[in-house]
UniProtKB/Swiss-Prot annotation:
It catalyses: Endonucleolytic cleavage at a junction such as a reciprocal single-stranded crossover between two homologous DNA duplexes (Holliday junction). Its main location: cytoplasm. This is Crossover junction endodeoxyribonuclease RuvC. It is found in: Cytoplasm. It comes from Pseudomonas syringae pv. syringae (strain B728a). GO terms for biological process: DNA recombination; DNA repair.
Amino acid sequence: MTLILGIDPGSRITGYGVVRDTGRGCVYVASGCIRTGSGELHERLQIVYRGVREVIKTYEPVTMGIEKVFMARNADSALKLGQARGAAIVAGAEEALEIAEYTATQVKQAVAGTGGANKEQVMMMVMHLLKLTQKPQIDASDALAIALCHAHTRSSLIPHGLGTARSRGGRLRL
């Protein structure tokens, strides 16, 4: 059984979700948000870094999935998001976690079955898949979705980052 950490990075709120991959599905372990307040950017990034390290030390996951930066209309927002991602990635790397990155579309596809799902649809599927009785905070829900996507990708025939598969004559070739 593998503990998986999902991170939904943000410069103001970073969501985290921890699930246990049993090999037959995932079980909810924990989720929450790291809130940075309204201080200077370097102070907020330090809070993200320390918060992610604390989650890692508390739950001891062996692998981490994190959302990739999307191109936002506001370049400044995209840069801040990228810096928050970097703080979270460094926290995971320092603890020797296996780290994988996913686009929002990949996460939605893995959890809701369509890359065009909205946040409410993703949250409902997260609740269904993890048998949650209460709605998690939206950033925590996104982080749980990332953890579920990572669990699904890790157990698929085509591991993350190894390219595409081709089929010839009914045989799968990597």
